[in-house]
């Protein structure tokens, strides 16, 4: 490995992390490490940024306890020199300042109440997305958020601006992950995947690519995603290991212990381990994944598959990032503060504060030494449930009379069997965009909380029910990366459960205060079914719709839920506001969501993971890309023959899908769809501007809609 690294690392030199004095007490990383020759530039960048930060934090009043903010600079040098050793000399100071801003911002917001944290995050995301995403200046409310604007405008969006934009997208995803994070009742395996998203390694990787000027295609990066993610999980768990004491202290001061996002805390809370035991488990897990990363890196590097110089630089940069970050965390004052007010005894109070009735069991490790109650085996509970479910009750009637059952009174059947398919799809991980949209619309409409919850219930049940039916109608095997509901429960039971959920939504609608709500509900649900009927009709008969017909279908099918939520909210609002701009805004949003979904289904690796490879083609769905292709290819009959002259319920061969994708490239279909999305996004933002003139400024709506364009 040394020879390979020396060939790639031209601006740095090998460095033995165990040669520093005084020696680091708790360092267990097994990665090789490199150190930049331009460390002085990074140190200077950090020093200059700290002055500006302290002034901003004082202006915002975010910390008044006198404790210093600690970041890149340490007794041994600067974080950037070890984590980004190949950073270009002219960018080292900028990267150091930006890293410090991220570290300090994280500390400042951790100490906030949940409400203030959400407001600060919203302010930051809107600033970043407006500045980089659509080129509109948004004046941040917080001085600490204003500090990032010059860097974003002059650096990330300047030279290598596309690399900078990639970084900002990753940073937004990191913030989104933290905003919806909750480790309550989560298993160890679930935590690892969750921390990979919320822990932010991707934004740090993209920053490294900008700092070093490394260029790779999205396809190249996806080809090494598995390697990156293994090391990424090890990295975020190492962060949890070294930052546990500090995080606990900050959350304790803020009264937000339940929001603590940390692997040590989870092992103590959900598995019953002591802090010492939890730390030992983390060490072993981290070293195991570090070794996996290095083995996979070397196998990939020496493998026969051709790879670009840029991709080799990219993955090597990731290795250096993981290595240098571990070294920095092991000794940096940011992670080893001496001004904590909480103790080991305080931290021990979270042991056993699990959500379930019993501790979880950590596979491959002995139970906690101090275990006082019986841990639940992951295998035992399902067996008990299965035994009860499969048992045949031989009792007929009462008192042994076999005829009593036939003449007895009506007994209502239990609902748990009917509910089970719905509960399954409701349990699958979702972005909850509809709930978010309802919440931010409510800044305008001020719907009472009880009515708002009913509307959320209606929209959630309708959405999930439609997904259950869609997956049957489309013969889709996957939903959100998991088996579709009908795979487990069968088509008949899934349809019955979806219909039962529709009945529940009607009941919910009758609980709303305004009698108009039931009529609104019936109108919009009728439109939803009309829109779906068009989609199914075209597919069944193999008839390609016009663009106008496609938009009509989308407005009724996808736009229906947006209109439903808004109309119900307007009806329940104590001060209803009627404006054509809001109605148009929701219509445009529905179109954008559907067309983007059409596009991503054919182009996104993430969609392939969650739904399957180009699943819309398997369905024979007349998406906007397919409509455009059939209108602009010289051989449309080849496409329609492959799509509609095949055995029902059989998918297309991958070779046929590849042919269709190549045909779309030749017809410039994807370029056309991107132009449509760009046009729609511009119209959405213009319509929002008009709506805000009547309804008032709504930064929540603006943040969500700006994010659509990234």
Curated annotation (Swiss-Prot):
Pfam families reported for this sequence: polyprenyl_synt (PF00348), Terpene_syn_C_2 (PF19086)
Binding site for Mg(2+) 3: 470, 474
Motif (DDXXD 1): 106-110
Prenyltransferase as annotated region, ranges: 339-710
Technological use: Aspergilol A shows a weak cytotoxicity toward MCF-7, MDA-MB231, and HepG2 cancer cells lines, with an IC(50) value ranging from 21.21 to 48.76 uM; whereas aspergilol B only shows a weak cytotoxicity against MCF-7 cells, with an IC(50) value of 27.41 uM. None of the aspergilols have antifungal or antibacterial activities.
Record key words, sorted: Isoprene biosynthesis, Lyase, Magnesium, Metal-binding, Multifunctional enzyme, Repeat, Transferase
Annotated catalysed reactions: isopentenyl diphosphate + (2E,6E)-farnesyl diphosphate = (2E,6E,10E)-geranylgeranyl diphosphate + diphosphate; isopentenyl diphosphate + (2E,6E,10E)-geranylgeranyl diphosphate = (2E,6E,10E,14E)-geranylfarnesyl diphosphate + diphosphate
Transferase as UniProt keyword: yes
Chain residues that bind substrate: 106, 239, 243-247, 334-335
Gene3D superfamilies recorded: Farnesyl Diphosphate Synthase (1.10.600.10)
Region (Disordered): 367-401
Chain location of the short sequence motif DDXXD 2 per the record: 470-474
Residue span of motif NSE/DTE: 239-247
Described purpose of this protein according to its UniProt entry: Bifunctional terpene synthase; part of the gene cluster that mediates the biosynthesis of aspergiltriene A, aspergildienes A-D and aspergilols A-D. The bifunctional terpene synthase AuAS converts isopentenyl diphosphate (IPP) and dimethylallyl diphosphate (DMAPP) into sesterterpenes. The C-terminal prenyltransferase (PT) domain of AuAS catalyzes formation of GFPP, whereas the N-terminal terpene cyclase (TC) domain catalyzes the cyclization of GFPP into 5 distinct sesterterpenes: aspergiltriene A, aspergildiene A, aspergildiene B, aspergildiene C and aspergildiene D.
Assembly and interaction partners: Hexamer.
Name the UniProt record assigns to this protein: Aspergildiene synthase
